[in-house]
């Protein structure tokens, strides 16, 4: 997000949906200009961005801005007046982020209390969304951007730090199912577009997690290190000292060259933009 010229050249599935006639809106209780976020969203096709500036001052109750309940309320109001065009609405929560100052007091542990608050807000939102006519054709995708900081003090080189869920709910989901495929946020683009029968050829690093014919793996990175995991091997590599710092599975070491190659391809792609 900090390199607008490079971002401008990226293929973006949100922009693709806008070109397909989708109505795009983004809802966030914090500062939409934080780290170039607004520029990134506009480039991605979002022409309506709701942020802390769009809420009454009395709702700005936390360090991050407006608590989640008011953000979900704003989203619901927008959905209630939404025209019959296809839409993509994105809600970014923030109340479960430290310092955990939320208008909710049910658990003694402030961290768990904040998690419970966001969970309660989301549950209420889904319950209200089910009452709208649009529910029967709506897909809600729930996914975090990073670990939730619980249990406390998880080491950077602990695989559990990067194990996050992705949950699909909504009237558009035909039946309950559990997907065991390995993947990462990179794969959301191809997976969703495939379900919508839209091309995802432009997203060279993304793969359809529901396609049994492709190799499923998860890639993640953090400053000066990367991880590459699948059902056979999970490896983490420290690029500073050129050492494997974690490796587990039936085929230890198997994914190291794949992880290195993936990282190199990412840098090559970034350098050309």
Question: Which positions does each model-derived feature cover?
Answer:
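Solvent-exposed soluble domains appended to multi-pass membrane proteins
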Residues: 1-273
């Amino acid at each position: 997000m900090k390199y607008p010229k490079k971002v401008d050249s990226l293929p973006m599935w949100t922009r693709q949906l806008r070109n397909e006639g989708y109505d795009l809106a983004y809802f966030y209780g914090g500062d939409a200009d934080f780290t170039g976020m607004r520029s990134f969203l506009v480039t991605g096709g979002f022409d309506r961005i709701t942020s802390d500036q769009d809420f009454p001052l009395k709702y700005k109750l936390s360090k991050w801005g407006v608590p989640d309940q008011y953000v979900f309320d704003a989203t619901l109001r927008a959905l209630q007046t939404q025209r019959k065009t296809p839409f993509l609405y994105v809600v970014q929560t923030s109340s479960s982020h430290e310092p955990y100052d939320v208008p909710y007091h049910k658990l003694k542990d402030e961290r768990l209390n904040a998690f419970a608050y966001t969970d309660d807000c989301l549950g209420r939102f889904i319950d209200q969304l089910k009452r709208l006519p649009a529910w029967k054709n709506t897909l809600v995708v729930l996914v975090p951007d990073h670990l939730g900081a619980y249990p406390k003090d998880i080491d950077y080189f602990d695989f559990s730090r990067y194990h996050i869920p992705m949950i699909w709910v909504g009237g558009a989901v035909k039946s309950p199912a559990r997907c065991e495929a390995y993947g990462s946020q990179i794969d959301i683009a191809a997976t969703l577009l495939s379900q919508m029968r839209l091309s995802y050829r432009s997203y060279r690093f993304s793969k359809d997690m529901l396609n049994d014919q492709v190799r499923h793996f998860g890639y993640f990175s953090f400053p000066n290190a990367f991880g590459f995991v699948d059902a056979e091997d999970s490896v983490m590599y420290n690029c500073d000292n050129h050492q494997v710092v974690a490796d587990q599975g039936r085929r230890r070491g198997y994914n190291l060259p794949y992880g290195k190659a993936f990282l190199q391809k990412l840098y090559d792609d970034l350098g050309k933009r």
